């Protein structure tokens, strides 16, 4: 096995020497786009942090939202390193730091965020299907334990990617795969497949949860009022969460398997490898925009959050109207808040 790993590692290194990467787009366009996302993400998540500091963690829902916020903030803080590295505005040593540490932390927190969104969907599912049944999964102690487990899992599977690396040189930092030891390349493949499994498992479960939630809400509205604009808006809210999750994360996971394969074998031609690299960078940027989308989810789903944000609270107060609207608004809070 060690012989196979060593051969794979040498292939990855030799390939980086004979297959130079086309970085014109990643050096010019993506750093600008990432800068916009970084500034917007820091602003939105700083406001969200201020709000959540004033909200006690007295429900599983709030616990999951707070963990999502922490993951998003850490992701955002990793972006300046990528921006400086990709734009070649920093010394080559920073590129080595990005490959061995900051990008690893970035991916780690991305998958923490993915699992937290899955737990949020599960929490909504339980509150809609079993609103009055008391069970241990509805206790904050359970939510905190699961959250710690998620962070611990991602930390321990990410740690070898920070350790199993060779000494950085000006030539080896051009491709992160060239920095990895033979065992590090093998572990990178293991982690990549593990993360693929995490994403698709969460996505399928979210799809099932929200399908059941939508059916439950639809049947409830049919029973009491057959045609209601509030009902349609509520359906849109439910599917917006699924849409954001799919649009942000699915493209990256379609691309990541062939990209990782191209990085760890010697069977991909240079043109295809460069195309996969651009596709990976484009879909990674799309996934990064999730740090700006999650604060919108807080506003849509969390009543306590909107009560703490003055501009949102003022806007809702202006739109508050008849008693029928008030009743519908409360129904929305029961189903989504």
Curated annotation (Swiss-Prot):
Does the entry feature the keyword Transmembrane helix, yes or no?
yes
| Record-annotated disulphide pairs | 99-176
Location in the cell: Cell membrane
Q: Any transmembrane segments, and where?
A: 32-52, 61-81, 102-122, 145-165, 194-214, 238-258, 282-302
Q: Which residues are glycosylated?
A: 6, 14, 266
Instruction: Give the UniProt keywords, A-Z.
Output: Cell membrane, Disulfide bond, G-protein coupled receptor, Glycoprotein, Membrane, Receptor, Transducer, Transmembrane, Transmembrane helix
> A single Pfam family, by name?
7tm_1
For whether the record's keyword set contains Magnesium, the answer is: no
Residue ranges, Cytoplasmic side: 53-60, 123-144, 215-237, 303-337
- The stretches that face the Extracellular side, renumbered to this chain, are 1-31, 82-101, 166-193, 259-281
Membrane topology qualifier: Multi-pass membrane protein
Q: Which superkingdom, per the lineage?
A: Eukaryota
- Molecular function, one GO term: G protein-coupled purinergic nucleotide receptor activity
Where does it primarily localize?
Answer: membrane
Q: Which GO terms describe its cellular component?
A: endoplasmic reticulum; plasma membrane
Physiological role: Receptor for ADP. Coupled to G(i)-proteins. May play a role in hematopoiesis and the immune system.
As for family, the record states:
Belongs to the G-protein coupled receptor 1 family.
Identification of the protein by name: P2Y purinoceptor 13
Q: Tell me what organism the protein belongs to.
A: Mus musculus
Where is the organism placed in the taxonomic lineage, from the top? Eukaryota, Metazoa, Chordata, Craniata, Vertebrata
The encoding gene is P2ry13
